[in-house]
């Protein structure tokens, strides 16, 4: 088994020039050629930003609706009441509730990928914050998941919204499609993500904003990208 894995990786590494930072177009082409798993692998971009997340004014966080989605079916839970519950259901939310939903979550129900809430329900959401927070599911105004426009938020989530935030080391990881996507769709998704991240550059960040960038599949080595080319995307 280990021998098979080693041979597979060796074959994949042979397709990459380790000392080269690829342009977006060529990088996408190379990473697609690395698809070798028996399932449709996720394409992920990783960026190392020149920020210090220990400072609140350098915390890069946001959301972007990818033009071609992520290729993943997203289950959405909504905390709302009265007419807003109806709006959520009509927009296609999978789970809708209030205190009852909070109780279900306390009892172990986490069968959704994104949580949206109206502002007046955040006190209820707060009761399960310790459960949702570590899973990256806590609603936040910066990602458009705390809003009165529930229908739009649910539609965005279902259409391929990706929420992102910089980690303690200044890295951002985000899915931008599947290996089965045409190269052009992966490229357009990545450009939309990078454009959004560039717009969120903190004014206090110094030096190069995008220090390193890489593209990879679920089961593949990473392909280095030209960070300067990404910083020039507006």
Curated annotation (Swiss-Prot):
BP GO terms, sorted: regulation of translation; translation
Gene Ontology MF terms: rRNA binding; structural constituent of ribosome; tRNA binding
One Gene Ontology cellular component: cytosolic large ribosomal subunit
CDD domains the record matches: Ribosomal_L1
Gene3D superfamilies associated with the record: 3.30.190.20, 3.40.50.790
Function: Binds directly to 23S rRNA. The L1 stalk is quite mobile in the ribosome, and is involved in E site tRNA release.
Record's protein name: Large ribosomal subunit protein uL1
Organism: Helicobacter pylori (strain G27)
Lineage of source species: Bacteria, Pseudomonadati, Campylobacterota, Epsilonproteobacteria, Campylobacterales
């Amino acid at each position: 088994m280990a021998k098979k894995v080693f041979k597979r990786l060796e074959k994949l590494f042979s397709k990459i020039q380790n000392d080269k930072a690829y342009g977006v177009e060529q990088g996408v082409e190379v990473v697609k050629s690395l698809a070798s798993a028996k399932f449709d692998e996720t394409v992920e971009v990783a960026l190392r930003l020149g920020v210090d997340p220990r400072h609140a004014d350098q915390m890069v966080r946001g959301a972007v609706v990818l033009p071609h989605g992520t290729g993943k079916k997203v289950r959405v839970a909504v905390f709302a009441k009265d007419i807003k519950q109806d709006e959520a259901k009509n927009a296609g939310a999978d789970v809708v509730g209030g205190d009852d939903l909070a109780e279900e979550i306390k009892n172990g129900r986490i069968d959704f990928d994104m949580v949206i809430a109206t502002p007046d329900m955040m006190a209820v959401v707060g009761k399960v914050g310790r459960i949702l927070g570590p899973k990256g599911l806590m609603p936040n105004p910066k990602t458009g998941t705390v809003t009165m426009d529930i229908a739009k938020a649910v539609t965005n989530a279902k259409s391929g919204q990706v929420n992102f935030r910089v980690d303690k080391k200044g890295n951002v990881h985000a899915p931008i499609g599947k290996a089965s996507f045409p190269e052009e769709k992966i490229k357009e998704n990545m450009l939309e993500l990078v454009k959004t991240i560039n717009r969120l550059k903190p004014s206090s960040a110094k030096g190069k904003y995008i220090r390193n960038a890489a593209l990879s599949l679920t089961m593949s080595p990473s392909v280095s990208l030209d960070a300067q080319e990404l910083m020039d995307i507006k």
